[in-house]
């Protein structure tokens, strides 16, 4: 089932998530719905708070970027991937700046500096403990989605100057003046159908 994506300004995006305690049918259904929602929105990552949920969980699918990732010489694990209770246990001192976007902040893209490489510990879809070392685009997407689980958005990393330049489009989102090619939920819990 395709779920509506909560848009910038909704409090659900600023709440910290709760660790997932066990693998249940309801969890598996949520994972299926999140993957379907991500694909419907042509996204490469989606975190539970973006669909109004509090589970410490996100999904990614970098298949659309597989060629670019291969050209960079980075391995790409089988996709899609599920990350339950993820934690970054190591990150490189070296950083890289790259443009990011977010399904919860439609049509806004800005450069963000992040560690180039990370090591993440998490549980997979089968609730098995895993550890993954990632660089390049995979590292960036994992960090971006992991931030959502602590109520952090990529716009939080921007300079005050860049934030001022985004004031109008972000205010429009907060006021519910937003459209996307996928269903949204505004800060007032109003559903905006896909355009």
Curated annotation (Swiss-Prot):
UniProt key word Metal-binding: yes
The record's active-site residues are 145
Task: State how the cofactor is bound.
Answer: Binds 1 Fe(2+) ion.
Ubl conjugation in keyword set: no
> What chemistry does it catalyse, as a reaction equation?
N-terminal N-formyl-L-methionyl-[peptide] + H2O = N-terminal L-methionyl-[peptide] + formate
Task: Name the family the entry cites.
Answer: Belongs to the polypeptide deformylase family.
Query: What is the name of the protein in this document?
Result: Peptide deformylase
Q: What taxonomic lineage is listed for the species of origin?
A: Bacteria, Pseudomonadati, Rhodothermota, Rhodothermia, Rhodothermales
């Amino acid at each position: 089932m395709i779920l509506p994506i909560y848009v910038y300004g909704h409090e659900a995006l600023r709440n910290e998530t709760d660790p997932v305690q066990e693998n249940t049918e309801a969890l598996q259904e949520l994972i299926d719905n999140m993957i379907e929602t991500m694909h419907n929105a042509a996204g490469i990552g989606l975190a539970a708070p973006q669909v109004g949920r509090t589970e410490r969980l996100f999904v990614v699918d970098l298949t659309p970027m597989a060629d670019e990732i291969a050209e960079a010489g980075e391995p790409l694990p089988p996709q899609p991937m599920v990350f339950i209770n993820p934690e970054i246990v190591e990150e490189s001192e070296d950083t890289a700046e790259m443009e990011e976007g977010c399904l919860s902040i439609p049509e806004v893209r800005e450069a963000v500096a992040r560690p180039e490489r990370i090591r993440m510990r998490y549980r997979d879809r089968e609730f098995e403990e895993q550890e993954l070392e990632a660089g390049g685009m995979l590292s960036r997407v994992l960090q971006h989605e992991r931030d959502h689980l602590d109520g952090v958005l990529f716009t939080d990393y921007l300079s005050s100057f860049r934030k001022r330049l985004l004031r109008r489009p972000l205010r429009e989102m907060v006021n519910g003046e937003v459209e996307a090619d996928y269903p949204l939920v505004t800060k007032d819990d109003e559903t905006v159908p896909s355009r």
